[in-house]
Amino acid sequence: SIYITLSLLVLELIRLSQRIKPWFPKWMKGHWQQTKVTLFFLIVFGVTGLMIHAYHTVMNPIVKNVYITLPKAAGDRDSLTIVMMSDLHIGEVIGKDLVQKYVALSNAQHPDMVVLAGDIMDYESRFAENAHIEDDLKQLKAPLGVYIIYGNHEYRANRNAKYRWLQKTGGTLLIDSVVQPDSTFYLIGRDDFIHKKRKSLHSLMEGVDTGKPIIVLDHQPWSFAEMNMNGVDLGLHGHTHNGQLWPYPLLMKLVYECPYGYYKKGPTQFYVSSGIGIAGPPYRVGTVSELVVLHIRFKAPKQTGERGKSTMPIQAS
């Protein structure tokens, strides 16, 4: 474990500091062997407890409520509730039982729409196929539908089999696609950044009425400036896992403009999820497995007064 290694490294630094400038109390120096044994067991029990908590964090995702106000009107719709799940990584670790838990958690939020923001599967599709997990995802309930985009893991291993399986889940697969779930706003699902031939956002937005709210799903959070330049109102991302295991969250801050959470660049707002699943071992330290519930408020439409005069727009709070 990285944490046992770090603990031993700290102990070695303490030992070296003692050699350079003695500072241990007399009772410790007089019982050094017993002290080393005690420290060893403290490390083992401490790391074991940490890993139990880290496993529990993965197995019990939290519900993260995010409140966002968009500056455009969406027809007669004043609000929209979206459940966002990214980075399920269905495979050897994330199996049928956990996916059923995710679905139940999503349905309990009573969302208008559900989005699965990439990396639905880990490497091989056979784990999802053999367990018929598509039947579980079909149980997701949302009146405006379920929408799915590719992540980088959808391009690993048997890509065509993954595509066929995703088509069976009951959701709408958006690969460089634009839809209007209920005609009041646009939802754009981008192909993953790893695919060098994916369409530009500018080309996807040809014919889009920028007077309506525009929400973009893009697995990897690299395109903040592009979204801002093209008039996108809200970008939803995953991919980073927020580092998953400490101290990697610290490194993520050096790599990404925003590796986790809410962010705003110009008029465009973003949310980067740490993901509901995991990649690799089933542990999280210093991060969370999350199901994101986006509570979106739209600008109120112009209303006509009794004598036909237009009233001032009202900003929804």
Predicted regions: what they are:
Residues 1-59, 301-317:
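Non-catalytic terminal accessory segments
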Residues 64, 69-303:
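Soluble catalytic domains of enzymes that build or remodel membrane lipids, polysaccharides, and related
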